[in-house]
C-alpha cells in the first residue's frame, strides 16, 4: 500500500512511525522549498526520530499523492482547505482520505470531513477521521497509543485500521464520523478551561468536575448534531479529553494555564508561536450551541473569557453559582429538567 501524509509537520511526521512500522510505503510532503534534499529522516521537534527507508520525502504534493491509495491530511484547521486544493488535481479517484485534524471551521462551523467534502467532492463517501488521545511525541517514540478510525462505511474504517495498526498503535473503528470529529474538536475547548482552572489554583476537584461536566456538554451538542452520545465515552471523547486536560504537553492546557495566571490569549500565542485550536473552536462551538439551542455553560464561559473580556475568576465563580441541576440529563435519555427539588 502507498500512503501519503501532508504536511510533514509534527503530527504528520509522527504518524509516519506506525504507518512505516505496519509496512506501508509512505511519502511525506512539506511546503518548505527544498526540504526533501536536506531532510534528516526526522523532525526538529521530535528529537531522536529516524524514520526507516520505506518513508521518503517529496518536494511536491503531486509526487506525494499521485500514486497513494491512502492520503492522510494532518494540517492545523486553518490549513485544511489550502492543502485540499493543493492535492485535488493529483489524487487518484479511488484514494481514501484520512482526516487527522481536530477543529471546527470558524466561519462555516463545518466539521473537518465536511470541509474536505466541499474541497474534494469526488471523494465524498471515502473520508475517514483519525482521532483519539495522541500526543505526537509519544506516537513518534513508539509508546503504546490508542486511536479511532471513523467512517459510516465501516469497511473503509477497517481498511484504515489495518493500514496503521501495530503492536504499539492500536486503532479501533467507529461508524460515528460526526461524533468522533466533534469530540476531537470540542475537547480542545474544555482543555483550555481545565488549564484556566489550574492556573487560578482551583485544585484537583475542580478540574475533575470540569472534565466530567465538559464531557456532558460535548455529548449534548453531539446528540443535537446526530452523533451517538456513546462515542463521547470512548477514545475520541473521554480519552482525548482526559489527555488534553491533564497532560503537560497539551497546547490547549498550556494556553489555559497562562490565561488563568493573568496572561491574555493573544500574548500567549505571540510569545509561543503555537497553534491552539481551542481558542478558535471556543467561538465556533459556542455559536453552534446558540444556533441549535444547546446548553453549554462551560464552553460559553470560556468563550466569554476569550472574546468578551470576562475575568477567568469571575467565569469560574459563575459556573459554580448556576442553579441546582440533576446529573442525569437528556444525553443519557433521562427527562429531568433542572432545577430539581428532592
UniProtKB/Swiss-Prot annotation:
Its EC number is 1.1.1.94. One of its GO terms (cellular component) is cytosol. Sn-glycerol 3-phosphate binds at residues 102, 132, 187, 240, 250-252. Keywords: Cytoplasm, Lipid biosynthesis, Lipid metabolism, NAD, NADP, Nucleotide-binding, Oxidoreductase, Phospholipid biosynthesis, Phospholipid metabolism. One of its GO terms (molecular function) is glycerol-3-phosphate dehydrogenase [NAD(P)+] activity. The keyword Protease does not apply. Pfam families: NAD_Gly3P_dh_C (PF07479), NAD_Gly3P_dh_N (PF01210). Its main location: cytoplasm. It catalyses: sn-glycerol 3-phosphate + NAD(+) = dihydroxyacetone phosphate + NADH + H(+); sn-glycerol 3-phosphate + NADP(+) = dihydroxyacetone phosphate + NADPH + H(+). NADPH binds at residues 11, 31, 102, 136, 251, 277. It comes from the Bacteria. The active site is at residue 187. It is an enzyme of class 1 (oxidoreductase). InterPro entries: 6-PGluconate_DH-like_C_sf, 6PGD_dom2, G3P_DH_NAD-dep, G3P_DH_NAD-dep_C, G3P_DH_NAD-dep_N, NAD(P)-bd_dom_sf. It is found in: Cytoplasm. Belongs to the NAD-dependent glycerol-3-phosphate dehydrogenase family. Catalyzes the reduction of the glycolytic intermediate dihydroxyacetone phosphate (DHAP) to sn-glycerol 3-phosphate (G3P), the key precursor for phospholipid synthesis. PANTHER family: GLYCEROL-3-PHOSPHATE DEHYDROGENASE (PTHR11728), GLYCEROL-3-PHOSPHATE DEHYDROGENASE [NAD(+)] 2, CHLOROPLASTIC (PTHR11728:SF1). This is Glycerol-3-phosphate dehydrogenase [NAD(P)+]. It comes from Symbiobacterium thermophilum (strain DSM 24528 / JCM 14929 / IAM 14863 / T). The lineage of its organism: Bacteria, Bacillati, Bacillota, Clostridia, Eubacteriales.
Amino acid at each position: 500500500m502507498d500512503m501519503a501524509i501532508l504536511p510533514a509537520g509534527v503530527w504528520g511526521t509522527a504518524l509516519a512511525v506506525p504507518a512505516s512500522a505496519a509496512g506501508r510505503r509512505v511519502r511525506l510532503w512539506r511546503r518548505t522549498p527544498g526540504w526533501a534534499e536536506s531532510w534528516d529522516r526526522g523532525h526538529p521537534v521530535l528529537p531522536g526520530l529516524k524514520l526507516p527507508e520505506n518513508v521518503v520525502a517529496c518536494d511536491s504534493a503531486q509526487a506525494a499523492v499521485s500514486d497513494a491509495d491512502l492520503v492522510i491530511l494532518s494540517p492545523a484547521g486553518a490549513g485544511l482547505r489550502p492543502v485540499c486544493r493543493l492535492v485535488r488535481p493529483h489524487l487518484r479517484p479511488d484514494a481514501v482520505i484520512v482526516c487527522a485534524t481536530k477543529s471546527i471551521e470558524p466561519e462555516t462551523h463545518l466539521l473537518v470531513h465536511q470541509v474536505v467534502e466541499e474541497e474534494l467532492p469526488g471523494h465524498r463517501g471515502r473520508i475517514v477521521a483519525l482521532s483519539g488521545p495522541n500526543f505526537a511525541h509519544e506516537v513518534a517514540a513508539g509508546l503504546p497509543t490508542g486511536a479511532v478510525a471513523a467512517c459510516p462505511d465501516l469497511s473503509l474504517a477497517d481498511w484504515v485500521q489495518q493500514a496503521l495498526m501495530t503492536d504499539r498503535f492500536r486503532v479501533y473503528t467507529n461508524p460515528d464520523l460526526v461524533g468522533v470529529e466533534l469530540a476531537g474538536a470540542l475537547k480542545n475547548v474544555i482543555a483550555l478551561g481545565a488549564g484556566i482552572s489550574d492556573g487560578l489554583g482551583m485544585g484537583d476537584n475542580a478540574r475533575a468536575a470540569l472534565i466530567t461536566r465538559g464531557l456532558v456538554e460535548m455529548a449534548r451538542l453531539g446528540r443535537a448534531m446526530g452523533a451517538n452520545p456513546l462515542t463521547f465515552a470512548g477514545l475520541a471523547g473521554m480519552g482525548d479529553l482526559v489527555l488534553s486536560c491533564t497532560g503537560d504537553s497539551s497546547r490547549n492546557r498550556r494556553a489555559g494555564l497562562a490565561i488563568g495566571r493573568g496572561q491574555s490569549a493573544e500574548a500567549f500565542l505571540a510569545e509561543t508561536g503555537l497553534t491552539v485550536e481551542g481558542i478558535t473552536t471556543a467561538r465556533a462551538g459556542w455559536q453552534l450551541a446558540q444556533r441549535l439551542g444547546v446548553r453549554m455553560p462551560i464552553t460559553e464561559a470560556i468563550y466569554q473569557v476569550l472574546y468578551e473580556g470576562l475575568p477567568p475568576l469571575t467565569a469560574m465563580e459563575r459556573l459554580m453559582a448556576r442553579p441546582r441541576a440533576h446529573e442525569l440529563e437528556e444525553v443519557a435519555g433521562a427527562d429531568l429538567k433542572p432545577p430539581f427539588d428532592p
